[in-house]
Amino acid sequence: MKTYLLFFFLLIGSGVLNFLSAQQITRYQVIKSFPIASSGGWDYIAVGPQNNRLYVSHGTQVNVLDETTGDSVGVIPNTTGVHGIAFVPSLGKGYTSNGRINTVSVFDLKTNQVLGQIAAGQNPDAIMYDEFSKLIITCNGRSSDLSLIDPVTEKVVATIPVGGKPETAVSDGMGKLYVNIEDKSEIAEVDINSRSVTNRWTLSPSEGPTGLAMDVKTRRLFAGCDKTLVIMDANNGKIIDRVTIGDGCDGVAFDPELKYVFASCGEGKLSIVHEENADKFVLAADVPTKRSARTIAEDPRTHTAFLPAAEFEKTAAPGERRPPMVPGTFQVLVVGQ
């Protein structure tokens, strides 16, 4: 018995158990898929607030699915060029960023009925709700700024220039926003009270930051760049680590209980990185998904991830940059253990 105990404690001291926790316990795989019959492109997907709903941006509408069965439970229409979805549960409202018409749609979380439209900046992309400031924030790609919207009055209360194309924003819950500036390969720190950029931190030599998530306890930022997940200290912009991931990452999610960082990569891979501690990160798994599955939402209650994807033709039509999507192939992949 003493020999076995000694070996066990040696394992702990050598860090082998941490390695096993990342490499063996992570058994994520695609467990099912939810087909969506309608046509059109897509961007972000969101898990609803305690209502067992998935909200899938899809061309000119948002498809609302039952998170467990994948059954359609509604459609939010007239969201042309929709990118993202955010929620304010206390008001019973949801919000979509409509990139092609420069608006934010307001909808009822119970009925999915559109309640109104709010003018935003140019090409609003990612959208989020900041619990600290009680504001909706949109990242406006073409006007290179953030729109801050009061969800009670449904008015834009401030616009913050960020000096580049803002792709995604996260909040530390204490008055700071962190924004991926895609065309500058940097993260901008924004003070929500002063309505200004207070720091700019380079991600170089990593390029093209898109997805962004944060561990608010360890104050680590996770930026999905070209084939690299960059881990940054949110206190000072110091690069903590760079972990190789798949190609074409456009979404990052973080599970605060399991300490997993999920990076969805369009090449057909979900890279999962384990946060051993604030300064140590290891690649736990590269889960095969489907080519085009580049964005992600993760439900921290069930530890399940959801990735929209579709099949595409092999060649592009004359004058087009990309091959067309094969009709009837749009779906949401469900990844779990």
What does each model-identified segment do?
Residues 1-5:
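Positively charged n-region of N-terminal signal peptides that target proteins for export
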Residues 6-7, 16:
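Cleavable N-terminal export/targeting peptides
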Residues 10-11, 18-337:
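Predominantly soluble domains enriched in secretory-pathway, periplasmic, or organellar proteins
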